[in-house]
Amino acid sequence: MLECYMGWNLEYAKRMLPKLERFEPRWLEEPVLADDIDGYAELNQLTSIPISGGEHEFTHYGFRQLLEKRAISVIQYDTNRVGGITAARKINALAESFSIPVIPHAGQMHNYHLTMSTLASPMSEFFPVHDVEIGNELFYYLFKGDPEPVNGFIDLDDDVPGLGLTLNHDHFDQFNITE
């Protein structure tokens, strides 16, 4: 996987793609700005590298437009941005109807459940937990229960309720909590 995080313009991406093809990356993530759907479509037709996007898309209507224009080969929605698990499941169903794989943006327990609940998802992203001062890692300070991969695979525990997370009281003293 190669991450561009919308850092390229269309012309630069068109120059880079032929140079990257020999490395056979699994996908190229967000090469151009998220709103440049025509640019995504042009790049997706230009290369053998699957183009992924959707991290900055917010509705299943937007994903339908991306799919109808054949703008992406891999959907990578952000569950928190699209409206949660229910909205993400609608996008998964849409992706299945277009035979497009879904690899939700970021790890975290809700995405693991979404990945395991649809044929459209061949894998989940996984980020090892390590201490940082700021960022999306706040999730890991607040909750316990994220699975540890074994030989590259994650198993979800069927014997725990809900998503399988519990509050991590060990770190609460680091936050201002109001009731």
Please place each PLM-identified region on the residue numbering:
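Divalent metal-binding pocket/active-site signature
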Residues: 9
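C-terminal extensions of enzymes
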Residues: 137-179
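Shared catalytic-loop signature of beta/alpha-barrel
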Residues: 18, 24-27, 35-153
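Phosphate/pyrophosphate-binding betaalpha-module
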Residues: 32
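Short acidic, gly/pro-rich beta-turn/loop elements at beta-sheet edges
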Residues: 12
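Ligand/substrate-recognition segments at binding pockets and active sites
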Residues: 6
